[in-house]
């Protein structure tokens, strides 16, 4: 995968560059990302997680082939060349089937890998760190690595079978907190030690050799570690470079390896840039993008309520809250406290569990009505200034059309701009 290997090669030669991975399946988030990459002439890495997308449909209802088609059709409609698009699979392994015995869970993981690779995903994160129903807790490095090597062999065979060659790029390892933000309130976070990182690498190298996969080791281009960044519902742990100094030095001894940092959402622009400089050259972002989407929609709903009588309004926020209460499975094990605390978390939490509800038909109908209501007449500038002040500046400067969709996309792109600046050292254009 030339874009990723070129990035790693340049980084290892001393360039403080990187790439960000957009981890979302929301159409407006993906449109924002594709348009931003197109305007700035950069490749775009879009990743699906094993929770979102799997051979059975995941929580999005999409298989890997469905997700590929969805993203590629969107890219085509926006004039973005598919040659600049990189698809990645995140946390691929037995994650979805931890409640099953390891034999069954890994059989499902084999099929998961086949479905991702056959669909043309080229960046494959092998994560077998989770214990299955009959496993010890925690798993040893050796077991984790053996299972990852097994999946790598499946991936290589599938790629050869479907494409006549294998150009897959692999990521191994995992961060300590769960994917997508911590479940509980954060108190302290341990940075991965150099010793633990080396142990993960060596265990995987040995397991790959046992599977006869020595030749693909140079294509293991990233190791997931915990650099000391995380967020929960109301707090952010900011990157502290001094705590990751030894870890950062350790990766310099490997020829074609950088770190991949998960849960970088809500870090400051300065922290994102420093992460890249410290060799955390792949930055994952997801909830921060849907958080920005939610912010923009809540702002537009407030504008709608100022402009229209209640009976004509979309009632987006009311519909959203009602559906979340009727179907609490995506938030009830994450948000705690009294009724008011949970209500606030449902709407405003950094962990953004609301992102699981946007595809709901009732909520989508309310969203479409909101957009229609505000598209009929120009939105008064003072209301844009009140509720979307950053977009107001762009509207006033003639850089942004004040339509509902463009205001939403611009707000999401404000987050993407921070990641672009961190990875490319420059700030270019929203589009």
UniProtKB/Swiss-Prot annotation:
An example Gene Ontology biological process: carbohydrate metabolic process
InterPro entries: Aldolase_TIM (IPR013785), GatZ/KbaZ-like (IPR012062), GatZ_KbaZ_carbometab (IPR050303), TagBP_ald_KbaZ (IPR023435)
This protein's pathway: Carbohydrate metabolism; D-tagatose 6-phosphate degradation; D-glyceraldehyde 3-phosphate and glycerone phosphate from D-tagatose 6-phosphate: step 2/2
SUPFAM superfamilies listed in its UniProt record: Aldolase
Family annotation (Gene3D superfamilies): Aldolase class I (3.20.20.70), putative tagatose 6-phosphate kinase domain like (1.10.400.20)
Cellular component terms (Gene Ontology): plasma membrane
A Pfam family hit: GatZ_KbaZ-like
NCBIfam families, sorted: agaZ_gatZ, PRK15458.1
UniProt record similarity statement: Belongs to the GatZ/KbaZ family. KbaZ subfamily.
Subunit structure: Forms a complex with KbaY.
Record function comment: Component of the tagatose-1,6-bisphosphate aldolase KbaYZ that is required for full activity and stability of the Y subunit. Could have a chaperone-like function for the proper and stable folding of KbaY. When expressed alone, KbaZ does not show any aldolase activity.
PANTHER family per UniProt: D-TAGATOSE-1,6-BISPHOSPHATE ALDOLASE SUBUNIT KBAZ, N-ACETYLGALACTOSAMINE PERMEASE II COMPONENT-RELATED
UniProt-recorded name of the protein: D-tagatose-1,6-bisphosphate aldolase subunit KbaZ
Organism: Salmonella arizonae (strain ATCC BAA-731 / CDC346-86 / RSK2980)
């Amino acid at each position: 995968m030339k874009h990723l290997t070129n990035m790693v090669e340049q980084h290892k030669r001393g360039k403080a560059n990187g790439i960000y991975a957009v981890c979302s399946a929301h159409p407006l988030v993906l449109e924002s990302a594709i348009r931003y990459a197109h305007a700035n002439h950069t490749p775009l890495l879009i990743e699906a997680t094993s929770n979102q997308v799997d051979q059975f449909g995941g929580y999005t209802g999409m298989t890997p082939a469905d997700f590929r088609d969805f993203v590629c059709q969107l890219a085509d409609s926006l004039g973005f060349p598919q040659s600049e698009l990189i698809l990645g699979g995140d946390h691929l392994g037995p994650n979805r089937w931890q409640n099953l015995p390891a034999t069954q869970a890994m059989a499902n993981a084999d099929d998961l890998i086949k479905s991702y690779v056959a669909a043309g995903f080229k960046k494959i994160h092998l994560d077998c760190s989770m214990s299955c129903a009959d496993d010890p807790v925690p798993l040893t490095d050796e077991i984790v690595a053996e299972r990852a090597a097994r999946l790598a062999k499946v991936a290589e065979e599938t790629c050869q079978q479907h494409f006549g060659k294998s150009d897959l790029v692999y990521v191994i390892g995992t961060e300590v907190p769960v994917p997508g933000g911590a479940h509980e309130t954060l108190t302290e976070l341990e940075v991965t030690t150099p010793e633990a990182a080396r142990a993960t690498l060596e265990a995987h190298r040995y397991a790959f050799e046992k599977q006869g996969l020595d030749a693909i080791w140079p294509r293991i281009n990233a190791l997931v570690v915990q650099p000391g960044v995380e967020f929960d519902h109301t707090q952010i742990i900011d990157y502290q470079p001094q705590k990751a100094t030894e870890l950062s030095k350790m990766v310099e001894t490997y020829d074609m390896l950088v770190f991949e940092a998960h849960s970088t959402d809500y870090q400051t622009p300065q922290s994102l840039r420093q992460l890249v400089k410290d060799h955390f050259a792949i930055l994952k972002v997801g909830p921060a993008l849907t958080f920005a989407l939610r912010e923009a929609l809540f702002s537009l709903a407030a504008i709608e309520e100022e402009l229209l009588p209640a009976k004509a309004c979309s009632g987006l926020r009311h519909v959203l809250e009602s559906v979340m209460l009727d179907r609490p499975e995506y938030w009830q094990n994450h948000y705690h406290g009294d009724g008011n605390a949970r209500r606030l978390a449902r709407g405003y939490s950094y962990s953004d569990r609301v992102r699981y509800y946007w595809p709901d038909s009732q909520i989508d109908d309310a969203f479409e009505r909101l957009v229609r209501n505000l598209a009929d007449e120009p939105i008064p500038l003072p209301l844009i200034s009140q509720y979307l002040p950053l977009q107001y500046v762009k509207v006033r400067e003639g850089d942004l059309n004040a339509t509902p969709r463009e205001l939403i996309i611009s707000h999401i792109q404000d987050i993407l701009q921070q990641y672009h600046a961190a990875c490319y050292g420059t700030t270019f254009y929203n589009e």
